[in-house]
Amino acid sequence: FFNNMAIAMERLKRDGKISKALVLDIDLHFGDGTVNILGGRGYATLVNPSSNSPSDFIRQVDKALAAETYDVIGISAGFDYAREDWGGVLGESDYTDIGRMVRETARKSGAGFFAILEGGYNHRVLGHNCMALLEGMREG
């Protein structure tokens, strides 16, 4: 199988563009493929917030972003934690906040940042939530 996040991180590492990376996996489902590939590499920290509370979820994201300085932050952007999806937790404004937090953290440290769409099951809201994350990533 292919794992888009692992391919992106491995390429950046192989090309000498990064030493330390954060994978922020905001998908409801644990990213075991990402962990299986990157978990033992030593340069990548993988964080998969999990909560039934939007504020607690955001606190976990904030804690992960503040823990260390990274050369790149990659968001595994699954949107099944959305209120209108299986997870039933995060709203559009939460996704905007996550994007903004990643952008601000990356800019402070000079890191790069990107997101890879990993999924979401409710197609009526998937595009809106994806746009909300991207809006946060591009603001300012």
Regions inferred by a protein language model and the residue ranges of each:
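A general "terminal functional-core" signal
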Residues: 1-140
